[in-house]
C-alpha cells in the first residue's frame, strides 16, 4: 500500500520542533538531511563513506564468495594470481555498479523503509544524478578490467547480470509481483559463471549446476529477511511474498526451495567429480539448512508471528550454508592435487 506524508503533518512537526526545549530538538544536521532542499555539509570522509555505502558492500561480499571458489574448481587447483585479481576486482566493480543503479531506482522505496531510509540517497548525502554517473563509471571500469584482465565472455556475462538486475528486477519486477525474488534473483546467479569462464573461456555443466544452486538458494534467503521487515516492505508498497501471503504459506515455499537447493548441490558431486570434503559439507550443512526451514514452518503453523517466528535464524544460516558450500568447492580440488 502507498505511504505518504501530508503537508499538514509536516507543518505540525515543524511547529513542534520550533517550540520544543533545546534538549528535545532534533539534530539540525538530521533536519537538513530529511528536507528536500539543501543537503547536509559533509566532510571528505563522510562523502567517501556515502559513495562506498551506495555500493552495498555486504551484498558484494556474498557475490564474490560464489566467484573465487569456482575459479579453483575450474583450474583443478590454484588459479593464476593475476587472473584471480582481475576477476575479483572486475566482479567487485560490476556488482558495485549494479547496486548503485538499484539505489538510484529505489530511492523512493528506501525513504519509506526504516531499514533503508538512512542510505545516502534518502538522506541527500549524494545527489541522485551524481550517483547515476558514479554507477556508470563503475560499470565501465568493471568491463575494462574483466575484458582485458580475464576475457570478454566474462565481461559480457557481468554486463548481462547487471542489465538483468537493473531493468528486469529493479524496474520491472520488484514493485509489481511477489515473484520478484525468484526471477530477479537470476542476476545473482552469474558470479559462478563469471568465475568459471574467466579460467576456461567457456561455459560447462559445472557452472550451470552452481548457477542453479544459487537460483534455488536465493528465495529462502530473501524471504526470511522479508519476514523480519514485512511491515517495511508493506509500507513501501513492495509485494514481497511475506507481505501478500500468510506466514505458513511462505514458510512452505521456503522449505520447498531449501530442499531443492540442497538436492541440486548434490548434483555437483557426479557432474564435477567432487571429493569427500564437498560431499560431507554439502550433506551436513544442507541438513541444518533444511532443519532451520522446517522449524520456521513449525513456528508459522503454530501461529507465531513477527519476532516469535525467528526468521533471522534461517537468514543467517542461509549465508553460512552458501559460504561453507563454496569454501568446500575451493578446498576439494586442492586435496586432489
Curated annotation (Swiss-Prot):
State the function annotated in the UniProt record.
Answer: Converts heme B (protoheme IX) to heme O by substitution of the vinyl group on carbon 2 of heme B porphyrin ring with a hydroxyethyl farnesyl side group.
Family, similarity comment: Belongs to the UbiA prenyltransferase family. Protoheme IX farnesyltransferase subfamily.
Top-level division of the source organism's lineage: Bacteria
Record's protein name: Protoheme IX farnesyltransferase
Q: Give the gene that encodes this protein.
A: ctaB
Q: Which organism is it from?
A: Cutibacterium acnes (strain DSM 16379 / KPA171202) (Propionibacterium acnes)
Give the transmembrane ranges.
Answer: 59-79, 81-101, 130-150, 153-173, 196-216, 250-270, 271-291, 311-331
Q: What is its EC number?
A: 2.5.1.141
User: Which EC class does it fall in?
Assistant: transferase
Q: What does UniProt give as the signal peptide span?
A: none
Q: Which reaction does it catalyse?
A: heme b + (2E,6E)-farnesyl diphosphate + H2O = Fe(II)-heme o + diphosphate
Ranges of Polar residues composition bias in the record: 1-17
Keyword Transmembrane helix (UniProt): yes
Amino acid at each position: 500500500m502507498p505511504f505518504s506524508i501530508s503537508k499538514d503533518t509536516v507543518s505540525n512537526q515543524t511547529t513542534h520542533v520550533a517550540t520544543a526545549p533545546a534538549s528535545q530538538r532534533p539534530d539540525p544536521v538530521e533536519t537538513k538531511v530529511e528536507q528536500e532542499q539543501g543537503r547536509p555539509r559533509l566532510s571528505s570522509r563522510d562523502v567517501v563513506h556515502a559513495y562506498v555505502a551506495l555500493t552495498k558492500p555486504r551484498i558484494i561480499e556474498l557475490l564474490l564468495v560464489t566467484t573465487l571458489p569456482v575459479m579453483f574448481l575450474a583450474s583443478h587447483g590454484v588459479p593464476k594470481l593475476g587472473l584471480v585479481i582481475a576477476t575479483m576486482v572486475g566482479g567487485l566493480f560490476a556488482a558495485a555498479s549494479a547496486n548503485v543503479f538499484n539505489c538510484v531506482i529505489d530511492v523512493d522505496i528506501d525513504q519509506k523503509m526504516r531499514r533503508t531510509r538512512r542510505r545516502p540517497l534518502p538522506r541527500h548525502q549524494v545527489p541522485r544524478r551524481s550517483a547515476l554517473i558514479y554507477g556508470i563509471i563503475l560499470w565501465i571500469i568493471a568491463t575494462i578490467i574483466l575484458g582485458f584482465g580475464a576475457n570478454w565472455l566474462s565481461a559480457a556475462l557481468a554486463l548481462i547480470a547487471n542489465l538483468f538486475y537493473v531493468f528486469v528486477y529493479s524496474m520491472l519486477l520488484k514493485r509489481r509481483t511477489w515473484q520478484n525474488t525468484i526471477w530477479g534473483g537470476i542476476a545473482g546467479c552469474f558470479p559462478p559463471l563469471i568465475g568459471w569462464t574467466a579460467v576456461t573461456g567457456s561455459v560447462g555443466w559445472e557452472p550451470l549446476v552452481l548457477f542453479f544452486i544459487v537460483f534455488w538458494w536465493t528465495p529462502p534467503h530473501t524471504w526470511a529477511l522479508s519476514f523480519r521487515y514485512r511491515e517495511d516492505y508493506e509500507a513501501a508498497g513492495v509485494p514481497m511474498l511475506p507481505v501478500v501471503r500468510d506466514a505458513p504459506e511462505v514458510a512452505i515455499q521456503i522449505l520447498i526451495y531449501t530442499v531443492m537447493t540442497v538436492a541440486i548441490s548434490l548434483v555437483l558431486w557426479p557432474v564435477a567429480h567432487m571429493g569427500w570434503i564437498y560431499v560431507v559439507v554439502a550433506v551436513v550443512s544442507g541438513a541444518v539448512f533444511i532443519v532451520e526451514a522446517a522449524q520456521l514452518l513449525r513456528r508459522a503453523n503454530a501461529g507465531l508471528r513477527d519476532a516469535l517466528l525467528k526468521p533471522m535464524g534461517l537468514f543467517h544460516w542461509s549465508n553460512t550454508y552458501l559460504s561453507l558450500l563454496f569454501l568446500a568447492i575451493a578446498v576439494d580440488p586442492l586435496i586432489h592435487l
